[in-house]
């Protein structure tokens, strides 16, 4: 039985608790939080304060870290990896090499295993980009996200004066995807690949015209995209736009000779982004513990781990039933 601790209990931590119920070879030791444990409403797991984590060291095989990539994981993953095997979902792509190097050093010094940057992007999408480019080296890879809720863009909307609440959807340009699948070679801009759709609730007396202008001209978020804005009531937003669906496509178009076109496509359609991401983390937590049991200490990404380590099924059965 693999003994698991959840570190942090937001949407992702809650998703890990759900996922562990579907994996009978795993047991949840508890949730560890910086909040007062008695205020944390879990789905049944015992909540402890983070200060109690080291006290439980002998009862935990792996910690699944469920904090954010901006401020939590750059500190928590190296810190906790001094004492435990760890898995995180660090997703700041540009900083992954730096994060890996820091965690790898600590993991090797302390004889631990840490699997970083798991999830679906980075994670499963990363694997599919690697497979596609290795198999069809003469080609182009495209990644499309959505349709789904972007938490970062929704937060940016909510920071605008006059907006009481908001949800933003990232929508892939399906026409472009179909043209690429048909073999067209396209030079694509940011605006070509994705659309943005905003549902906003205005505060009383807010200037709708000014707010619309502020949204469509916001650099790094909306200025480079075709953006549609809907003003709705809080009731409608709560009813129709508070879920966390997401998904995306990795598309690789290539050739095996001058006249033979080949397309590799991988899709996700998710009703809950955090619950799916959590399920990926749990599978890689199993791999993490297995690598630790083999004394293969250090940091790993999805590129480094053989698929057999993810499955609860023994490799002989995998060869017989899945190969």
What is each of the regions a protein language model found here?
Residues 88-89, 114-118, 144, 167-168:
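General beta-strand structural signal in soluble alpha/beta enzymes
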Residues 262-323:
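NAD(P)-dependent Rossmann-like dehydrogenase/reductase catalytic/cofactor-binding core
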Residues 53-62, 70-89:
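Rossmann-fold NAD(P) dinucleotide-binding segment
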Residues 9:
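Glycine-rich Rossmann-fold phosphate-binding loop(s) that bind the pyrophosphate
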Residues 124-140, 155-165, 287:
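Oxidoreductase and adenylate-handling cofactor-binding alpha/beta cores
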Residues 90-114:
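Rossmann-fold NAD(P)-binding glycine/threonine-rich loop
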Residues 3, 14-15, 22-54, 149-285:
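C-terminal substrate-binding/catalytic lobe of Rossmann-fold NAD(P)-dependent oxidoreductases
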């Amino acid at each position: 039985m693999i003994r698991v601790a959840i570190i942090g209990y937001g949407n992702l931590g809650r998703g890990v608790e759900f996922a562990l119920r579907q994996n009978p070879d795993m047991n949840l030791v508890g949730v560890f939080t910086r909040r007062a444990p008695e205020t944390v409403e879990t789905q049944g797991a015992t909540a402890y304060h983070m200060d109690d984590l080291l006290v439980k060291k002998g009862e935990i095989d792996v910690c699944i870290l469920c904090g954010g990539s901006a401020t939590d994981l750059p500190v928590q993953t190296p810190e906790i990896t001094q004492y435990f095997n760890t898995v995180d979902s660090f997703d700041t792509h540009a900083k992954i090499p730096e994060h890996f190097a820091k965690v790898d050093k600590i993991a090797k010094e302390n004889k631990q295993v840490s699997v970083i940057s798991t999830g679906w992007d980075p994670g499963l999408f990363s694997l599919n980009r690697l497979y596609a480019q290795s198999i069809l080296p003469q080609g182009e890879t495209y990644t499309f996200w959505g349709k789904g809720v972007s938490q970062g863009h929704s937060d940016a909307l909510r920071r605008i004066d006059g907006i009481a609440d908001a949800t933003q959807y990232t929508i892939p340009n399906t026409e472009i995807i179909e043209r690429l699948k048909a073999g067209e070679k396209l030079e694509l801009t940011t605006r070509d690949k994705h659309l943005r759709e905003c549902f906003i609730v205005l505060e009383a007396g807010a200037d709708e015209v000014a707010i619309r202008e502020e949204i469509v001209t916001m650099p790094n978020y909306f200025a480079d995209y075709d953006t549609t804005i809907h003003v709705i009531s809080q009731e409608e937003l709560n009813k129709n736009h508070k879920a966390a669906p997401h998904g995306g496509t990795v598309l690789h178009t290539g050739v095996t000779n001058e006249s033979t076109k080949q397309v590799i496509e991988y899709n996700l359609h998710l009703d809950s982004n955090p619950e799916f991401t959590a399920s990926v983390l749990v599978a890689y937590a199993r791999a993490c513990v297995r690598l630790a049991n083999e004394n293969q200490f250090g940091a790993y990404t999805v590129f480094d781990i053989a698929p057999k380590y993810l499955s609860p099924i023994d490799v002989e059965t995998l060869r017989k039933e899945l190969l």
